[in-house]
């Protein structure tokens, strides 16, 4: 149908009737979602495959949803991906931010089940630095992070992608360089780096068994 007469509905005007306006707005949002899915995620996937690359699409996360079906962009990925931050709000399993991220994990797992993907990835343990006022900062350690990893596994994730491990060229610059304000700060200068093997083995073995 002709789009032009209904455009004022985007500014809150009722065109024809409330029902007709709502139906137009539903069509509008659905179309935007389809265009973004096909022309961004679909196109990137096609180009990547032409170059023999595997795609991970961390589409929408918890607080950046665009209009459309959440599974649609993720199904364009070879490995659908979610995110789970290591923040004070997410370590408290009742906080709204935690619940939103849990939904993102489960949405990615659902995408894998519906579209036949064998792996579900998650950007894991992302944290803010001091400038954002999070009290955790460099205080994150494996016993604390295990709660998040176990939650990811329980929600269907089977490939943990640790965020982040910046290159550390200067031994004396402790606790090390970072990705701007973002952690967690997983590198050889961490105070528990030499004791990390049990933790990394746990994540690797759990991921392998779940895959």
Regions found by a protein language model. Give the residues of each.
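Carbohydrate-binding surfaces of carbohydrate-active enzymes
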Residues: 1-80, 85-211
């Amino acid at each position: 149908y002709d789009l032009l007469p209904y455009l004022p509905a985007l500014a809150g005007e009722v065109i024809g009737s409330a029902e007709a306006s709502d139906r137009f707005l539903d069509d509008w949002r659905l179309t935007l979602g389809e265009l973004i899915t096909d022309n961004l995620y679909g196109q990137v996937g096609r180009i990547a495959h032409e170059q023999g690359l595997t795609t991970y699409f961390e589409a929408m996360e918890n607080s950046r949803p665009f209009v459309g079906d959440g599974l649609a962009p993720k199904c364009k990925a070879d490995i659908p991906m979610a995110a789970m931050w290591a923040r004070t709000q997410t370590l408290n399993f009742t906080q709204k931010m935690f619940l939103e991220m849990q939904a993102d994990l489960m949405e990615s797992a659902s995408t894998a089940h519906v579209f036949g993907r064998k792996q579900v990835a998650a950007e894991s343990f992302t944290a803010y630095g001091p400038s954002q006022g999070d009290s955790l900062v460099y205080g994150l350690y494996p016993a604390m992070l295990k709660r998040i990893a176990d939650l990811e596994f329980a929600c269907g994730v089977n490939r943990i992608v640790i965020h982040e491990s910046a290159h550390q060229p200067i031994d004396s610059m402790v606790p090390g360089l970072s990705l701007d304000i973002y952690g967690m700060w997983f590198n050889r200068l961490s105070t528990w780096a030499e004791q990390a093997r049990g933790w990394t083995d746990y994540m690797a073995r759990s991921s392998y068994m779940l895959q």
